[in-house]
């Protein structure tokens, strides 16, 4: 979620993939954050883009746009903000601020395609899939300041053990349980959809300081190696398109 920093409601896409070699910090009102830029991976970005379109996701693509805390904050858990950040990044901006919002099922299916894209990329890479989006919160209207820590705990548990229950929920249900802005947790289903059914919970922590409940969740994918025949077939599928 870009928080209307570089992507505005006059042209607001459901899914926007970055295809660039660098992503700098945006000015979110107090000047750009003094953090290192994220280094892009052009080859993997292009491959993911081809896979998404081949699987009939109507994507937008961007270059030269600054990224905000929704993208940069998780990187601070991986290294020193003065940089350079470890590894390279492929940002995906999801339009969760203006209706119609893509469904939870759509997020999940995009994650499944993301997995196939990563598995079929010719270079042997170690890839971590990161999702962001605040847990329960609402910043406007009669429920401004709303938190629901019980729902947040249930959401995190379902994400680990029974994600299909979350896939079947409507956006309105997410908003009712977690606040309008808290509905952005559907973006976590992209990450979970990119993993196998068999995951190990490595770390889980929540903290509700004021306006937003914040969680850190780390899974290890215990799924086996991909079937090479299926990988080759998927490469042909992408190439055919």
Residue positions per predicted region:
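Short, solvent-exposed loop/turn segments at secondary-structure junctions
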Residues: 138-139
